Amino acid sequence: MIRPIYTLALLFFVLTTVCARNKKDDAHCIGNIFPATKTDSTQLYIEEEDKTDYSKFAIQPIRVDTIWGDWEIHARQFYDGKKFTYDKTTHADYAVRFNVFKGGKPVFKGYKVNSKSLMGPNYTKGFELGLFEQFEITPTSVYIGFGYCEPETDNCLERVLALNADGTVRKYETSIASAEGDIDMYVTDIYWLYTLYVNELSLATPNAASIQKVLNKYCTTDFAKQLQRETLKKNLLLGSDQFDYQWLRSLEVHLMDEKTNTCIVNYKRADGKMVYKRIHLQLKPETEYEYLVSGVSDATEKDLPAMPNGEE
């Protein structure tokens, strides 16, 4: 069931694209899921001059500056020549440049993404790339969310960019909508749980503290403790031996059964086999629509919910 008021609030929270241009204000428009610790340090980042007149565009570019632990992160949307007209207004399809430091040393300098490099075959003219203002950060990785949307609509795709401390970059597909079209926070949270958990586990040297932070964000205390002991070779949540992070491209989250507070997820392995799991959800205290993952059990294709209006 799509809840209209909640849906609008969720889209505003997830796809918001307006942030103060003032550098002092920028520090207050960031709310990391793990509290930031500011430290005194020499200036690592010197901002490049941008002489573009942004007043001609419908939406102003976002800038993010934040410090978390020994991470220092700077992100800048900027105009790189891509624009289009929508409803008589000019929209820029901004690119984003990242400068990321860890322990006082550069990890990514001038790393650039745009809608073509991030969306690949899903690139569509007339859509614009929006940068999420809140980053999720662990000791080993910085996760940046993007909404790729048709202006003034909820016709959007989502991507997550993982910038890892070892210098590797990974791109993940997520969604705010279930396979049946339900838009709800539980869908987003399950996608992000799988994305962050799998990314952390698949690093060359997984970090226990990073994994714990991710699990504590999205799971109940008891289930987080269970998953903390798991690996990619054998994992209760993932359900396949030697899970490959690229399999997440096919991940689907299905409509929640409100009687049991469970939903089915599935993905396709490289050998073509479909894997189904039933995710158990527990309502967060003092909330109406927010859930934590409390468990997982095996499922089959027969457990999938019926598609609305007889769709297949």
What annotation goes with each model-predicted range?
Residues 1-36, 41:
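Bacterial Sec-dependent N-terminal signal peptides
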Residues 39-134, 181-257:
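Surface-exposed acidic loop/strand-edge motifs in secreted or periplasmic proteins
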Residues 93-95, 154-159, 273-280:
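Short, surface-exposed coil-to-beta transition loops
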Residues 101-107, 167, 271-273:
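Residue-level signal for glycine
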Residues 112-117, 175-178, 295-304:
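Short, solvent-exposed aromatic-acidic interface loops
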Residues 117-158, 163-164, 241-271:
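Acidic, glycine-rich flexible loop segments
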Residues 159-178:
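Alpha-helical oligomerization segments
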Residues 168-170, 274-312:
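Short beta-strand edge/turn micro-motifs at domain boundaries
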